[in-house]
């Protein structure tokens, strides 16, 4: 058995709706099933989703505040006022800034941009920045991807005579800033049809309004910010992402070309993963390490030399960010382990930790421990701790932190993520309170991650063609993630570790008609918990592996499970003790039927764990449900093994079977051996077995055990009698078959057991042991005979 690490949530779609979509849209049942599950269960909604490019953008002037904003900006341009774009330091922020900068430059505006320093100024507009902007002669500020919470700063701007236009997409608070115009789809009174635009999406709509036509040349920037900011990829966001990725593949932006080249990507093959894993992390890294201005300069650059230099600088900053995150994560993990793994919520803090990457570290702690996690960087000079939090399903982080408002002067966020600032001296109190809240909120089940399953399919369903069809639903992202498929009860054909450090795993699974490769990155430990021949279920993402111009389907493993017990065949393996040592001690049950077998274990701790089974009652009473049974040596009888296993439900059985040369006869006497020995006894008349048995054995090339065994068989059958240790033939004894002897029967069964245990294949052994575990008395007798 191999337990899944996650809770698999399987929601099977309405098959009538699947059939209807399949027939009306001429798509495969696999694609139709996913559309139904994603909520596109009518032909009209599904067709629109699949053919997003045929849709139209909404009129930007449907958004509240758009006309006022456009009019004021056009007035500033016509009067040659200086306009400042006030942006944010993440990928959404820098693309928003670039979209607005490009638009205003195209309109010949006097324009510049300002992005606050994350470390000195923090997020959003600030009073000092506004005063500085005013002193530099600017009369209009346009915020992008920020500003909706800048109530105080708006008052300062008004006092200074600065006009402010806010474009944002973050949740509006109860009080909105008093400014010239607010362009925000979620503001009260806004009837814009789509509310989930990213910051760059709102900026793109303003650009559309200002230019009087759809700014196609800005779609690549809009797509990058939209995908990077993890907003839902449906409706207008899906249109932006789809058309924007097409534009990105043929972009003329020198900076983007250089950055993708440095990341090892191909601009002509760019997709949502290119943005998510290559562009976004690098654009985000700039503002995490230093001021974000170089990211904007990169996106705006029209000089190839400058673009190359900026891309190299940004790529280097990303490498620094990766090293920083790795170091901080290692330190944070060590802290968590020192604090104790019994905590229901994690709060770690350290002086010198970069506040720009604490959110990434918090996410990694959640991945590692699956607990709500807060990671704080401490500024010792100011005595404050600043950080980020990430949560798990079932724990509302924002509500929980709201209960700690008295020690959190600054915090904000939503149920799954938050940011905060507090006094460094209050960190222990925050840890204590958050753990108490989590203790009272979370159940044991909540600490098991949830894996949603989109589709249940067979091995034969995953083909190059079906994966290509599934890509009709791309680009994938929030609310339209790459589908996770479940392949149930396939046969595991092969499993092995791969990679330079053997940290990854590759499997081959099959059913009656097809086979499929499965790859799990950083899942090398799976190899130790499964054996070929097992029935395995795997949840993963479908992908195409292309090598030497040959395409093959594969499944990227997210989780795996084996519901049946497994047999690990370690007979004759030299490294068996290493394998046994690596098993979790809480599950390990080492069984021996001979006391001296324990001496063959090199590890003292393992020797102390051995359970020596010496009676059938002891074997029957041994609780092995859920255990990893390690059988060190063969049982003395089939009955003993049956009593050990019948009715039990172990998860695994490890066969070691260290052989002892005295355990079984080296040879089983043939009938001719018995004939010769009987004739010998008739001729001798009397024979002292103890005194002369070894001489006879040596003369015949037999073992002493062979002589003793044949003697006991003759005694069982009444052929001989023993007086004072001397053996003599009984005259007139009734003729009987050797198999009538209980001694002969027992040894015959033991020899058959020896053959079965030592020479059967692992598959044959497992089938046979299954009978022992499930048998009733009638089945037991049947097992004895087979």
Swiss-Prot record:
The keyword Nuclease applies. It is found in: Cytoplasm, Nucleoid. Keywords: Coiled coil, Cytoplasm, DNA-binding, Exonuclease, Hydrolase, Nuclease. Its EC number is 3.1.-.-. Its main location: cytoplasm. GO terms for biological process: DNA recombination; DNA repair. Residues 485-563 bind DNA. InterPro entries: DDH_dom, DHH_sf, DHHA1_dom, RecJ, RecJ_C, RecJ_OB, SSDNA_exonuclease_RecJ. It is an enzyme of class 3 (hydrolase). It comes from the Bacteria. One of its GO terms (molecular function) is DNA binding. Disruption phenotype: Cells lacking this gene show only slightly increased sensitivity to DNA-damaging agents. However, cells lacking RecJ and with a mutated AadAB enzyme were extremely sensitive to these agents, as sensitive as recA deletion strains. The doubly mutated strain shows 10-fold impaired growth in the absence of these agents. A recJ deletion suppresses the lethality of pcrA DNA helicase depletion and increases survival of the strain in the presence of H(2)O(2) but not methyl methanesulfonate, although the surviving cells are very small. Residues 300-332 form a coiled coil. Pfam families: DHH, DHHA1, RecJ_OB, ssDNA-exonuc_C. The keyword Nucleotide-binding does not apply. GO terms for cellular component: cytoplasm; nucleoid. PANTHER family: SINGLE-STRANDED-DNA-SPECIFIC EXONUCLEASE RECJ (PTHR30255:SF2). Putative single-stranded-DNA-specific exonuclease. RecA thread formation during DNA double-strand break repair requires RecJ or AadAB. Belongs to the RecJ family. Interacts with SSB (sbbA). NCBIfam families: recJ (TIGR00644). This is Single-stranded-DNA-specific exonuclease RecJ. The lineage of its organism: Bacteria, Bacillati, Bacillota, Bacilli, Bacillales.
């Amino acid at each position: 058995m191999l337990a899944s690490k996650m809770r698999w949530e399987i929601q099977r779609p309405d098959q009538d709706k699947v059939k209807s979509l399949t027939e009306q849209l001429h798509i495969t049942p696999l694609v139709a099933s996913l559309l139904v599950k994603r909520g596109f269960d009518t032909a009209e909604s599904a067709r629109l989703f699949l053919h997003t490019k045929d849709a139209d953008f909404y009129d930007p002037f449907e958004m509240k505040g758009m006309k006022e904003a456009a009019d004021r900006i056009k007035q500033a341009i016509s009067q040659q006022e200086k306009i400042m774009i006030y942006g944010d330091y993440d990928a959404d922020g820098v693309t928003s800034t670039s979209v607005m900068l490009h638009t205003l430059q195209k309109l010949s505006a006097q324009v510049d941009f300002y992005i606050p320093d994350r470390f000195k100024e923090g997020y959003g507009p600030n009073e000092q920045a506004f005063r500085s902007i005013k002193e530099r002669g600017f009369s209009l500020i346009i915020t992008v991807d920020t500003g909706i919470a800048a109530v105080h700063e708006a008052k300062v701007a008004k006092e200074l005579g600065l006009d402010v236009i806010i474009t944002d997409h973050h949740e509006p608070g109860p009080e909105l800033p008093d400014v010239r115009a607010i362009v925000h789809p979620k503001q009260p009174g806004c009837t814009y049809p789509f509310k989930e635009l990213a910051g760059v999406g709102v900026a793109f709509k303003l650009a559309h309004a200002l230019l009087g036509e759809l700014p196609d040349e800005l779609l690549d920037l809009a797509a990058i910010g939209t995908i990077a900011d993890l907003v839902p990829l449906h409706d207008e966001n899906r249109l932006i992402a789809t058309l924007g990725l097409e534009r990105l593949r043929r972009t003329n932006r020198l900076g983007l070309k250089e950055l993708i080249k440095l990341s090892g990507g191909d601009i002509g093959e760019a997709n949502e993963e290119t943005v998510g894993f290559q562009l976004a992390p690098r654009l985000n890294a700039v503002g995490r390490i230093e001021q974000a201005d170089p990211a904007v300069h990169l996106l705006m650059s029209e000089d190839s030399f400058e673009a190359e230099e900026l891309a190299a600088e940004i790529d280097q900053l990303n490498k620094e960010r990766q090293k920083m995150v790795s170091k901080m994560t290692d330190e944070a993990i060590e802290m968590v382990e020192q604090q104790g793994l019994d905590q229901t919520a994690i709060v770690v803090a350290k002086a010198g930790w970069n506040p720009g990457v604490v959110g990434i570290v918090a996410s990694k702690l959640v991945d590692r421990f699956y607990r709500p996690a807060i990671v704080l960087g401490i500024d010792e000079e100011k005595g404050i701790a600043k950080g980020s939090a990430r949560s798990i399903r079932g724990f509302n982080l924002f509500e929980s932190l709201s209960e700690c408002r008295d020690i959190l002067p600054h915090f904000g966020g939503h149920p799954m993520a938050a940011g905060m600032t507090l006094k460094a001296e209050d960190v222990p109190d925050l840890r204590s309170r958050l753990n108490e809240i989590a203790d009272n909120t979370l159940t044991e089940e909540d600490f098991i991650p949830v894996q949603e399953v989109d589709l249940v399919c067979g091995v034969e369903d995953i083909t190059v063609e079906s994966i290509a069809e599934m890509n009709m639903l791309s680009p994938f992202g929030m609310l339209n993630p790459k589908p996770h498929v479940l392949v149930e009860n396939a046969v595991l054909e092969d499993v092995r570790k791969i990679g330079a450090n053997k940290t990854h795993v590759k499997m081959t699974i099959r059913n009656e008609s097809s086979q499929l490769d499965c790859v799990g990155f950083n899942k090398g430990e799976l190899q130790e918990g499964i054996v070929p021949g097992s029935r395995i279920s795997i949840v993963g993402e479908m992908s195409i592996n292309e090598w030497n111009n040959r395409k093959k389907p594969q499944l990227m493993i997210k989780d795996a499970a084996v519901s049946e017990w497994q047999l690990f065949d370690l007979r004759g393996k030299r490294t068996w003790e290493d394998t046994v040592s690596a098993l979790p001690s809480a599950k390990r049950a080492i069984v021996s039927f001979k006391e001296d077998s324990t001496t063959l274990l090199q590890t003292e701790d393992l020797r102390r764990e051995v359970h020596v089974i010496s009676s059938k009652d002891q074997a029957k009473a041994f609780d092995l449900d859920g255990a990893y049974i390690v059988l060190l040596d063969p049982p003395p009888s089939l009955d003993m093994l049956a009593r050990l296993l019948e009715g039990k439900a172990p998860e695994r059985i490890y066969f070691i079977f260290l052989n002892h040369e005295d355990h079984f006869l080296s040879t089983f006497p043939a009938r001719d051996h018995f004939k010769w020995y009987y004739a010998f006894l008739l001729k001798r008349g009397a024979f002292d077995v103890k005194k002369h048995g070894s001489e006879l054995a040596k003369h015949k090339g037999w073992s002493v055990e062979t002589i003793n065994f044949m003697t006991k068989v003759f005694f069982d059958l009444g052929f001989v009698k023993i007086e004072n240790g001397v053996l003599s033939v009984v005259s007139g004894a009734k003729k009987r078959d050797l198999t009538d002897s209980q001694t002969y029967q027992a040894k015959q069964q033991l020899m058959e057991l020896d053959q079965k245990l030592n020479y059967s294949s692992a598959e044959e052994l497992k089938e046979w042991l299954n009978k022992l575990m499930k048998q009733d008395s009638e089945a037991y007798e049947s097992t004895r005979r087979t």
